Amino acid sequence: MKLIENWFSERYSDNLQLSFRVSDQLLSIKTDYQRIDLFDTYDFGKLLAIDGTVQLTERDEFIYHELITMVPYHLTPRPPENALIIGGGDGGAARRLIDLGLKHIVNVEIDDQVVEVSKRFFPSLSSAFNDSHVKLLIQDGIKYVKNTSEKFDLIIIDSTDPEGPAEGLFSKDFYNDTRKIMNEGAVIVSQSGSPFYQPKAIKLAYSGMREVFSDVRVYTGFIPTYPSGFWSFTVASPWTMKPRPVNMSGKYFNADVMEGSFRLPQFVKELIT
């Protein structure tokens, strides 16, 4: 990706984009699956983009990674001991689960170059892959879920948007396969896009999960570098989810966020009804 006057821009539509002033472009490669760009920005530190969309920045990655791990962590009947991450090649979700005390984490990433870029530029996140509690597999997550005999307390779909290699991660067939590898009381969570700019993504995740799981809920959070800053996650279980008391906090997550993130604006409620 070429810079225009030292700015990287993520285009949301033909009429709108979010731009970051950058001091340098550190990397631009085309893998077998996607294009990866790495920029050094003035306000947000290093920025990782895949196919032109922001995946994480040094300054605000903690928000996304806390939301996709710490919220579902508190929805299982007891603290989960093991987890499966599909995607998440930067290591941020695995790093957070280690901090939460999980004993066994399987992280399945389809593109080894995402892992290599993270090891080079985001060592605080990718250090998770050196931890004895984490098993990193470079393979197709959809095929892994279909073929594995392991079962999990928590399944995290930490993917790009529902297109290209990630499209199948939002399908009913995939959710059916995840249902088969869930321990009793387990939950599954997926990022589901911006309700404002990507309503199809949240509808796709919610409707797909509703066909498979009896309890499906949406929660949201504020992530400054994602489209609109307003981001959604969809969490589900074959069992009724009853939040456990929250006695911990992160930089973003706390007991108030655990409760408030499920309080949805009316237009979001209407998207999923």
UniProtKB/Swiss-Prot annotation:
Q: What reactions does this protein catalyze?
A: S-adenosyl 3-(methylsulfanyl)propylamine + putrescine = S-methyl-5'-thioadenosine + spermidine + H(+)
Q: Which residues form the PABS domain?
A: 5-238
InterPro entries for the chain: PABS, SAM-dependent_MTases_sf, Spermi_synthase, Spermidine_synt_N, Spermidine_synt_N_sf
Task: List the keywords (alphabetical).
Answer: Cytoplasm, Polyamine biosynthesis, Spermidine biosynthesis, Transferase
Spell out the subcellular localization from the entry.
Answer: Cytoplasm
Chain sites annotated for binding S-methyl-5'-thioadenosine:
Q34, E109, D140, G141, P165
User: Which parts pass through the membrane?
Assistant: none
Q: Report any one BP term from Gene Ontology.
A: spermidine biosynthetic process
Active site at D158
**Is Transferase a UniProt keyword of this protein?**
yes
Record note on quaternary structure: Homodimer or homotetramer.
Cited function: Catalyzes the irreversible transfer of a propylamine group from the amino donor S-adenosylmethioninamine (decarboxy-AdoMet) to putrescine (1,4-diaminobutane) to yield spermidine.
What the record says about family reads: Belongs to the spermidine/spermine synthase family.
The name this protein goes by in its record: Polyamine aminopropyltransferase
Which organism is the protein's source? Thermoplasma acidophilum (strain ATCC 25905 / DSM 1728 / JCM 9062 / NBRC 15155 / AMRC-C165)
Q: What is the lineage of its organism?
A: Archaea, Methanobacteriati, Thermoplasmatota, Thermoplasmata, Thermoplasmatales
